[in-house]
Amino acid sequence: MAAPSPGPREILAPSPEAGRRAAASSSGHRGLLWRLRDKQCRLGLFEIGPGHELHQVMCLMQAGLWAATQVSMDHPPTGLPTEEDFSEVLTQVHEGFELGTLAGPVFARLRRSLGLAEEDYQAALGPSRPYLQFLSTSKSKASFFLSHDQRFFLKTLRSREVQALLAHLPRYVHHLQRHPHSLLARVLGVHSLRVARGKKKYFIVMQSVFYPAGRISERYDIKGCEVSRWVEPAPEGSVLVLVLKDLNFQGKTINLGPQRSWFLRQMELDTAFLRELNVLDYSLLMAFQRLHEDERGPGSSLIFRTARSIRGAQSAEESGAQNRRLLPDAPNALHIVDGPEHRYFLGLVDLTTVYGLRKRLEQLWKTLRYPGRTFSTVSPACYARRLCQWVEAHTE
């Protein structure tokens, strides 16, 4: 991938050793109850420990991300983002590897707008605790990681996907400013990793849609089509955490109650934006969690929720134009919608596939291969319309 102008900066990276010692000292004071609860919440996920095939890569990513976040802590961006911020490439040289941070000031501002403290971000992604791996049902060859607290999701990307993401980044940021309660997954960082003189590998950091995951009972990846959209469910009693697909959802509905109209409108706004970007093959992630009796209804937190939900809007009219809603009093509130009986985790992910020549040829081949059946490779307009129709048909 060609480095955007004005060209990369290269600096020696600070060491995360002091931060690792502090985090290890803090973690040593956690009690038995906390550790048991942590183990239960991670049922079906796998710690990337010594001996795991991805352990070395994980250690390099952790050390690199710790140092990269330290830069934004030492030099926090001010003012509005500039063209130079969007094109900045900062390369930090470590012993045996280099980690690049692309458009770092832009993502630092985005993290700050979400109320995410850089110290918390650094601690979660740094070397204090191992990442988690899960068995993905995706057909891509990407590697997937979760921070140990499952708050952040890391995924490897191809260079052309990174190019598309960075090309769309100014419009992505603008869309989130216009629609602060958008369902689009929040990308928090884009990085490259080069070991010794090897080839660069790219990865992104995102907020996990499925957080907090402790009581989630079902997970789905929805594209609104049928070809290759079935996953064999885990056997009864299995600890595997599987993300199921469209055909697994047949006969089910999402009961959002009064929130349904907001959800349908936000899907229209977000898919229209992705259509304008000429993007397709994105997914609606969904997960279910049954609400406890004391969690149903706004309750005593209504004033707090209302204040947080309208913060940043200048008027009721502006709030309506932005399609804001009453956010739940919960972590990761932007991706959580409460229905009468269930809490739903909802988000649009995988926003980097552009409808170019490669996808047009793939669409032609699939039309011949699967006559009369629906598949994911269609024009962005058709893709957006079909996914919105699926949502309307499966919500109440």
UniProtKB/Swiss-Prot annotation:
Biological process, per Gene Ontology: negative regulation of mitochondrial membrane potential; phosphatidylinositol phosphate biosynthetic process; positive regulation of apoptotic process
Superkingdom, natural source: Eukaryota
Span of domain PIPK: 38-395
Subcellular location: Cytoplasm; Membrane
Source organism per UniProt: Bos taurus
Region annotation (Disordered) ranges: 1-24
Record flagged with keyword Transferase: yes
Quaternary organization: Heterodimerizes with other type I phosphatidylinositol 4-phosphate 5-kinase.
Keywords associated with the record: ATP-binding, Cytoplasm, Kinase, Lipid metabolism, Membrane, Nucleotide-binding, Transferase
Entry EC no(s): 2.7.1.68
Function: May act as a scaffold to localize and regulate type I PI(4)P 5-kinases to specific compartments within the cell, where they generate PI(4,5)P2 for actin nucleation, signaling and scaffold protein recruitment and conversion to PI(3,4,5)P3.
Top enzyme class: transferase
InterPro entries: PInositol-4-P-4/5-kinase_C_sf, PInositol-4-P-4/5-kinase_core, PInositol-4-P-5-kinase_N, PInositol-4/5-P-5/4-kinase
SMART domains registered for this protein in UniProt: PIPKc (SM00330)
Protein name: Phosphatidylinositol 4-phosphate 5-kinase-like protein 1
MF term (GO), any: 1-phosphatidylinositol-4-phosphate 5-kinase activity
Gene Ontology cellular component list: cytoplasm; plasma membrane
One Pfam family matching this protein: PIP5K
Reactions it catalyzes: a 1,2-diacyl-sn-glycero-3-phospho-(1D-myo-inositol 4-phosphate) + ATP = a 1,2-diacyl-sn-glycero-3-phospho-(1D-myo-inositol-4,5-bisphosphate) + ADP + H(+)
